[in-house]
UniProtKB/Swiss-Prot annotation:
This is Small ribosomal subunit protein bS16. The keyword Ribonucleoprotein applies. It comes from Rickettsia akari (strain Hartford). NCBIfam families: S16. Belongs to the bacterial ribosomal protein bS16 family. Residues 92-111 are annotated as: Disordered. It holds the Pfam family Ribosomal_S16. Gene3D superfamilies: 3.30.1320.10. GO terms for molecular function: structural constituent of ribosome. One of its GO terms (cellular component) is small ribosomal subunit. Keywords: Ribonucleoprotein, Ribosomal protein.
Length: 111
């Protein structure tokens, strides 16, 4: 079973609130999850300490078992001071390079 650390949306219309959850990769975004390991409230100011709240010990455990974070959650984990496995860092770098290449191709087409 592939396990991901990802965001599950909650809150009201136009007022998002996300739970950081450990879930089976095949499960729906807001469906069943194995464990809740934090919250993310994008409505709060970026310098607010309650904007991103993570259970660091549980995230370290799940990363150790092979769970892969999504890009957004990986950024939160790095900001919290936790280290990501090298494999995850490499995947993030490759995705960033591909994104830059796509955007530069699109800019060249438009020009």
């Amino acid at each position: 079973m592939a396990v991901k650390i990802r965001l599950a949306r909650g809150g009201a219309k136009k007022r998002p609130f996300y739970r950081v959850v450990i879930a089976n990769a095949a499960a729906p975004r807001d469906g069943d999850f194995l464990e809740k390991v934090g919250t993310y409230n994008p409505m709060l100011a970026s310098d607010n300490s309650e904007r991103v709240v993570l259970k660091k010990d549980r995230i370290e455990y799940w990363l150790g078992t092979g769970a892969k974070p999504t890009e957004r959650v990986a950024k939160f984990i790095e900001q919290a001071g936790l280290t990501l496995p090298e494999k995850v860092k490499k995947e993030m770098d490759v995705k960033a390079k591909n994104r830059k290449a796509r955007s530069s191709k699109q800019e060249a087409k438009e020009a």
